[in-house]
């Protein structure tokens, strides 16, 4: 009962989760948003490209103008209020790029280890401090950290969870494009 009461406090903590649809942390974030009834969306590469082929159609995401993962990452960081990176240090590959993009777009970012549940109160405080309504969630793909999807799912469920009777129905994102910055001009 104690954990159910605790999770109810987090109801409405963020209005929307965005992510890029890659295996691992990205899909964990989208799955948790769907499960908890939190609005979700984000950008995926053109053609819905991902390491396992294509991003499943169940995730309603906008396709970036290119198939480049870096362009998708930049758009998701740009369109968020802040980025939560769920990863063990040191950051590598696309996860390191996400941190660079957060710095470039001057968006708050926070790196958390998904196995350290004690960080949840700190993350809640950080979300409130920065008045985060649209949260970009990023981290390693499954092939880089085999258990990262499961760990991220558990972490995000504890962070954003709510009692079943307070569960909202997620608004499915529309396919309508928001403004797309000329991603070809972005320098990484």
Predicted regions and their residues:
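Low-complexity, Pro/Thr/Ser/Gly/Ala-rich linker/spacer regions in secreted
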Residues: 164-168
